[in-house]
Structures are given as C-alpha cells and as structure tokens.
C-alpha cells in the first residue's frame, strides 16, 4: 500500500509540475487553455474555472496534457437552422450562446442560427421573431453545447498557432524546464536533509554505528592518515588503501588504521567486515555542511544525474532494447522499493525521474515537446509557419509511434516485474 501511495504522489507531482509549465506560459503568451489534465482516459473529476479552463483528473497514470485552443479539432460547428438562446451583456454583445435545452437563461433571446463567425468577425446571425438579425459576440463569450458542456469561444488571437513564435517556443519548453527545476530543488532539499554534501577531497570520516571502525574506537570527524602503511589524504585514497590492505586478508585478520583524533595520532587494529566480495571498515566520507556547499552539492547531484541519463540515452540509441526503457509499471516498482528505504530514497528517486522526464521530453520526436520545439525552430528559420495540416500529420505519426512504444514498454515491464 505504501508503494502505491508513493507512486501516486511522485507521479502526480511530476505531471503537475510539467504540465503547469505549459499551462502558465501558454496563459502568459495569450493562448486560451481548454483543459489541464492529469492522467489519461476516462474522467474521474472535473472542474471549470471562470476563465473557461477545464481541470480534469483521469483514470490512467500515463502522463497528462494541456489542451490549447487551435489544437486539433477545436472548432464548434453550428448547423444552419439550429435553435439557440443568446444572452447579451450590458453593451448588447452576445456573452453566451446556448445550443442545449438545459442551463436556460430566462432573459435570453431565442434565435435560429443561419450564420456565424466566432474566430475573426465575432458575430452570429439568425432569425429572431422571423426577422434576420446579426449580433456582435463578446471576445470571451461561451457556448453551451448540445450535451450541456460549456466552453469559451476561441478567437484567432487566443489560438496556439497565432501566438508569437517566442511564446510558442517557451510554452513548449516550459514543461521540461519545470522538471529540471524540480529535480534541482529536490536534490538540494535532499542534501540539506542529509546534513551536507560528502567531502571526497578530505580524509575526515563519519563513523557508522556498530561498524568495524566504531568498535576500534574511531569517532565522527576523526582523520584517517594511513591504512597498513598506505597514506590516506582523501576518500579515494582511503577506499584504495582498504582494497589493497584487504586483498589477501584471511578470516579474523585485522588491518592497522592510523588516525588523528583531537590532534593526537593513534594506531588501532580494525577487523574489516565483508559485504559481497568487498571489505569495508564502517566509515563514510565527512560532510561539507556550509549553506553554499549544500546548494552546490544539490546542483552537483542534479548535473551528475542528468549526465547519467544522457549516457543511458546514448546507449539506447546505439543498442536499442526494451529492457533499457521503463514505463508506469517500472516507475511503480521503483517507487515501491524507494518507499521501503525511507524518505531520502523517495526524494532521490523523484529528483532523478523529474530530470529524466525533462530530458526525455526534449527528444525531437513529434508528439513530444522536443518535436514541437524543433518545428518552432524550423518555422523561425523559414520565417513562415508550417501548414497546420502538415504539422497535424507529423504529430499524429509521432503519437502513433509513442503509443506503440508505450504498449511494448508496459508489457515488458509487467513481465519483468510480476513474472
């Protein structure tokens, strides 16, 4: 149960942070956001705000999306002769067009629609008491569709394709950007929770409770200067010295550890503990505990994580295998394991997954943010927009590829995790 809760929390935070990036910058760029969705498939919960944005929580944990005006099949069709009820504002502009038999306004004006333009001229024409009349439509007017769904109209100036190239570019990049920011923030938080960043340049150590060094009398912040005569000036020197000193170590044998404690030099016999095929003496690198050190430590962890992911991506390109990929099932399995190991493991996993999600979404494949950014760049270079039909076909092809890949990865994950 703890694993499921951890998975839901991690998944929810990653998706919300990612999609909020798209949502926020779309709004800032003047684009009308139709829907902010967490998950895919059937709706579990929905809410419409005053700005006309629908917020939905959906059943399948396969990502999320921000649907913007002008994307796909976004046009509202009103057939000639359709009965409608118009609600006017104080200026005489239509603020609501009701095509349903519900949500009726007693002050509304009945009309049989004969023509309309809700994108450019913002007008609606029809028969009112057998007389043809035309009314101006307010820029933020809403339409109540036949099924009772109320949505805002989308004039050309609030549609995605008519936003500035810079606005579209930052809107597409903002999702991955938010994931990078989240990853960095969580790594910094992790370093603060751990008390600092390991100082691998120092020979000062932290002593593990009930470990070999603790039993021999070493304490936190003691300075190991030699092991079996091998000089130690850093953590790397220490690990190498332990390996050399234990290379031919027999059962019950000890090694000599020379250390400095309170300015006094001491030498003790330490019996290393064997874990798998290696020996340890029960110490960890000391911590850099300054505020700046912790901030830089978090950034260092984020950079190291990104570098690891990029290397994995390179390996995927040179030698593709489904076993190198993971979907929601693999994410659940990792969340379950992290939950058993405590908060620090959960935060570390969340940070790595967030950076992973950011990098993955920047791959220039249609349907991913990277593919949209690539088309934005091509448009900027050509200085003319790509045809909507062309962009739609490219995106559809990308979606098809991603769906097939997701099904294959999920099936592979199920077989690997549960069987």
Curated annotation (Swiss-Prot):
GO terms, biological process: proteolysis
Residues spanning the membrane: 169-191, 301-323, 343-365, 392-411
Keyword presence, Glycoprotein: no
SUPFAM superfamilies: PDZ domain-like
Gene Ontology CC entries for this record: plasma membrane
Subcellular location: Cell membrane
Annotated catalytic residues: 19
Keywords (A to Z) from UniProt: Cell membrane, Hydrolase, Membrane, Metal-binding, Metalloprotease, Protease, Transmembrane, Transmembrane helix, Zinc
GO molecular function, one term: metalloendopeptidase activity
InterPro entries, A to Z: PDZ (IPR001478), PDZ_sf (IPR036034), Pept_M50_Zn (IPR004387), Peptidase_M50 (IPR008915)
Main location: membrane
Homology family: Belongs to the peptidase M50B family.
NCBIfam families associated with the record: RIP metalloprotease RseP
Protein name (record): Putative zinc metalloprotease SpyM3_1689
Species: Streptococcus pyogenes serotype M3 (strain ATCC BAA-595 / MGAS315)
């Amino acid at each position: 149960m703890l694993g499921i809760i951890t998975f839901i929390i991690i998944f929810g935070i990653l998706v919300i942070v990612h999609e909020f990036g798209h949502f926020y910058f779309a709004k800032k760029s003047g684009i009308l956001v139709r829907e902010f969705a967490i998950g895919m498939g059937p709706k579990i919960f929905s809410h419409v705000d005053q700005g006309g944005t629908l917020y939905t929580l959906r059943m399948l944990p396969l990502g999320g999306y921000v649907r913007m005006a002008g994307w796909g099949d976004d046009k509202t069709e009103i057939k000639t002769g359709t009965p409608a009820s118009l609600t006017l504002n104080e200026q005489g502009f239509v603020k609501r067009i009701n095509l349903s038999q519900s949500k009726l306004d007693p002050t509304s004006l009945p009309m049989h629609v004969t023509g309309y333009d809700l994108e450019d001229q913002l007008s609606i024409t029809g028969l009112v008491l057998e007389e043809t009349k035309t009314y101006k439509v307010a820029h933020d007017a809403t339409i109540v569709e036949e099924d009772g769904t109320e949505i805002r109209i989308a004039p050309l100036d609030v549609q995605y394709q008519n936003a500035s190239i810079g606005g579209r570019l930052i809107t597409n990049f903002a999702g991955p950007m938010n994931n990078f920011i989240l990853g960095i923030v969580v790594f910094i938080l992790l370093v603060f929770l751990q008390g600092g960043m390991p100082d691998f340049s120092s020979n000062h150590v932290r002593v593990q409770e009930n470990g070999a060094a603790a039993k021999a009398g070493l304490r936190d912040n003691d300075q190991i200067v030699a092991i079996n005569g091998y000089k130690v000036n850093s953590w790397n020197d220490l690990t190498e010295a332990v390996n050399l000193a234990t290379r031919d170590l027999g059962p019950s044998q000890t090694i000599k550890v020379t250390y400095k404690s309170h300015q006094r030099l001491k030498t003790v016999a330490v019996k290393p503990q064997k874990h798998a095929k290696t020996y340890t003496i029960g110490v960890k690198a000391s911590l850099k505990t300054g505020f700046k050190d912790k901030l830089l430590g978090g950034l260092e962890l984020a950079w190291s994580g990104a570098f690891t992911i990029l290397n994995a991506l390179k390996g995927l390109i040179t030698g593709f295998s489904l076993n190198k990929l993971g979907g929601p099932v693999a994410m659940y399995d990792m969340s379950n394991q992290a939950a058993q190991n405590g908060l620090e493991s959960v935060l570390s996993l969340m940070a790595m997954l967030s950076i992973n999600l950011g990098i993955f979404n920047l791959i220039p494949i249609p349907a991913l943010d990277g593919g949209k950014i690539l088309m934005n760049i091509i448009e900027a270079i050509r200085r003319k927009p790509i045809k909507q039909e062309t962009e739609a076909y490219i995106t559809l092809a990308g979606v098809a590829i991603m769906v097939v890949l997701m099904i294959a990865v999920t099936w592979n994950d199920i077989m690997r995790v549960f069987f």
